[in-house]
Design a protein with these regions (language model features):
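Hot-dog-fold acyl-thioester-processing enzymes
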Residues: 1-56, 112-136
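HotDog/MaoC-like acyl-thioester-processing domains
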Residues: 5, 69-70, 80-136
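Short, well-ordered turn and helix-capping elements at secondary-structure junctions
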Residues: 12-14, 60-66, 97
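Hydrophobic beta-strand-centered segment that forms part of the acyl-chain substrate-binding groove
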Residues: 37-88, 104, 108-110
Length: 136
């Protein structure tokens, strides 16, 4: 089902006084994974923007399951679905040492072309199709 994986490591400064990754940092991990995923699929935000195309996050749902701590390596995974005009990046992060689920997230994104909400973007439709093919 997941069509992309990225391994990362927790840095000390990402943790709060409790010694765990601060909740806001997980959004950075999720965003970095999406950007690396798009880049791996030859999709550039800069090039899209130059064409008048902007992909924007409209909402994020995150369920926190197991905390990550300084030095933990983790695997961030994703696949893409679509609901109406929204592209849904379904993302999870697993702690590498024991494969425990750290977070589960749904990132809803929309595409705006020349300032107007678009119903689709061919580059993203291809990613949805690849996700669906992997699920079958």
């Amino acid at each position: 089902m997941y069509i992309y994986e990225l391994e990362l490591k927790v840095r000390d400064y990402e943790c709060d006084i409790q010694g765990v990754v601060n909740n806001s940092v997980y959004q950075n991990y999720l965003e970095h994974t999406r950007h690396e995923f798009l880049e791996a699929n030859n999709i550039s935000f800069a090039q899209l923007h130059d064409r008048g195309v902007d992909a924007m996050v409209s909402s994020i749902e995150i369920a926190y399951k197991t905390p990550l701590r300084p030095g933990d390596s983790f695997i961030s995974k994703l696949y893409v679905t679509k609901e109406g005009v929204r592209y849904i990046f379904n993302q999870v992060i697993y702690r590498k040492s024991d494969n425990k689920l750290a977070i589960k997230a749904k990132v809803h994104a929309v595409v705006v072309i020349d300032g107007k909400l678009a119903s689709s973007l061919p580059e993203f439709e291809e990613l949805v199709a690849r996700s669906q093919a992997k699920a079958e």
